[in-house]
Amino acid sequence: CFGLTPLFNQSVSQKAEIVRVGHKDVRGCIACQRCYELGKCVFDDIVNELAPKFEEADGLVVASPVYFASANATLVAVLTRLFYSTHFDKTMKVGASVVCARRGGCSATFDELNKFFTISNMPIASSQYWNSIHGREQGEAEQDEEGKQTMRVLARNMTFLMKSIALGKEKFGLPETEERAFTHFIR
């Protein structure tokens, strides 16, 4: 994803893997809640392949092209089902989203992807600018010097954050949790 993998792999004890989902045939979540019974999504596809990798990982970088000021629909289907069907604690796994556009829609897409992290107690790695890079055709993003610098800073910041959290867990443990309270707006 925009040259981030080598940057993460160069960092001490960090290993990154790219998984491309945009070209896959993936259906959206139907909120059937069978994942609670099965321990995995009822639709047996790439989502169930990603779930154990996600559980083991210290962080997750999600990258998407921008389509109509939103992320790739297949990616959103994968993320929705991945986050919904995995019931392990995601607290303090570091998340980062990266978007690529010809011109506009980056901020809206960036926000859309970050919501998966924030609802899951996952801190978000930041950079010196929003994590976006520009280019339409393959290879054009390589010409975006500011975007490439933003990606390098993001890789370093995310690696630092994951290492800091690992040290913090060792020394202090995870933050205290509360039983989740649910508010229903229908009275």
Placement of each model-derived feature along the sequence:
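N-terminal beta-loop-helix "entrance" segment that forms/cooperates
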Residues: 20-41, 137-140
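Electropositive phosphate-/nucleotide-binding environments in soluble metabolic enzymes
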Residues: 2, 26, 44-48, 72, ...
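Short beta-strand elements in bilobed, periplasmic/extracellular small-molecule ligand-binding domains
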Residues: 15-20, 30, 123-131
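Residue-level recognition of specific faces of alpha-helices
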Residues: 28-31, 53, 81, 150
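Helix-loop-strand module that forms the ligand-binding subsite of alpha/beta enzymes
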Residues: 42-129
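Glycine-rich phosphate/pyrophosphate-binding loop and the adjoining helix
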Residues: 123-187
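Short secondary-structure capping/turn micro-motifs that flank functional sites
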Residues: 25, 70, 133-134
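N-terminal beta1-alpha1 ligand-phosphate binding loop
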Residues: 1-13
